[in-house]
UniProtKB/Swiss-Prot annotation:
Superkingdom of the source species: Bacteria
Active site: 164 (proton donor/acceptor), 168 (proton donor)
GO CC, alphabetical: cytosol
Family (UniProt): Belongs to the DapB family.
Enzyme type, top EC level: oxidoreductase
HAMAP family in the cross-refs: DapB
Keyword terms of this UniProt record: Amino-acid biosynthesis, Cytoplasm, Diaminopimelate biosynthesis, Lysine biosynthesis, NAD, NADP, Oxidoreductase
Official protein name in the record: 4-hydroxy-tetrahydrodipicolinate reductase
Family annotation (Pfam families): DapB_C, DapB_N
Record function comment: Catalyzes the conversion of 4-hydroxy-tetrahydrodipicolinate (HTPA) to tetrahydrodipicolinate.
CDD domains: DHDPR_N
Length: 275
């Protein structure tokens, strides 16, 4: 029995906090091979990606040109994968570039609009190229979302609070948006109005989805990624909470996504769809 070729992986955002964790995880995975690393921070240009990540040399330099690195992922026997943890401003173009090169994107960068995701889905399907957009790679968060969907069948009042580090660029988080979307799929409207509300300070009640779910965003140093889904009814409060205390907790989900995306020919949104 011949051993299958490892999956070529490009990490975009290689010098970021999540990018470093991905480099460590991919370097240790027997069925994967790090072939490229990209980061726009000039401080790390030419540095060994493994040294920057803190896992020792991997003989892959960090470059600042995504397209030239994507070419490296197309030169192997197996279709390559790009893992993207960059910035909301550039992620849409990153995904389109990867698909255009036949490299399958696994995207943890949040901030994409619904219209952008729809457009990328059409682009990926036309190219018969798999793409995974995952707001949260934590298995624990997926379990929380599933529990929230079950609870929402019995509660009419719900609000979401998401708490992240103060370097996060988008709000609310992709995870909170995804959670609200999952609750909305039941086809019910939440939080029927009992009183006419007045905000003394604009935005005090958070953002509101079309289904009337309030989402509140907290940005403070010390947090990594946390979320509460709070249900209320007469005489009771039901709270679901998930806390990420170390980014390494995302890596089993990232590695699973890398393996699964090689089998896809279209875009899938959400880790729960491949579990």
């Amino acid at each position: 029995m011949t051993k299958e070729s490892p999956i070529p992986v490009v990490v975009n955002g290689a010098a970021g906090k999540m990018g470093k964790e991905v480099i460590k995880a991919v370097s240790q995975a027997e069925d994967m091979m790090l072939v490229g690393a990209v980061d726009l921070n000039p401080k790390y240009r030419g540095e060994d990606a493994g040294e920057v990540a803190g896992c020792g040399p991997v003989e892959v330099p960090i470059l600042d040109d995504l397209q030239s690195v994507l070419v490296l992922a197309t030169q192997e026997k197996v279709q390559g994968v790009m893992v993207d943890f960059t910035h909301p401003d550039g992620v849409y173009d990153n995904i389109r570039s990867a698909i255009a090169y036949g490299v399958r994107p696994v995207v943890g960068t949040t901030g994409l609009s619904g219209e952008q995701i729809k457009d990328l889905g059409e682009f990926a399907e036309k190219a018969s190229t798999g793409c995974l957009i995952v707001p949260n790679f934590s298995i624990g968060m997926i379990l929380l979302q599933q529990a929230a969907v079950q609870a929402s069948q019995y509660f009419d009042h719900v609000e979401i609070i998401e708490l992240h580090h103060n370097q996060k660029a988008d709000a609310p988080s992709g995870t909170a948006i995804k959670t609200a979307e999952m609750l909305s799929e039941l086809g019910k409207s939440f939080n029927p109005a009992k009183v006419e509300e007045t905000e003394t300070i604009r935005g005090s009640r958070g953002g509101i989805t079309e289904e009337n779910i309030h989402i509140h965003s907290v940005r403070l140093p010390g947090f990594i990624a946390h979320q509460e889904v709070i249900f209320g009814s007469t005489g009771q409060i039901y709270t679901l909470r998930h806390d990420t205390t170390d980014r390494s907790s995302f890596m089993p989900g990232v590695l699973l996504a890398i393996r699964k995306v090689t089998q896809l020919k279209s875009l899938i949104y959400g880790l729960e769809k491949i579990l």
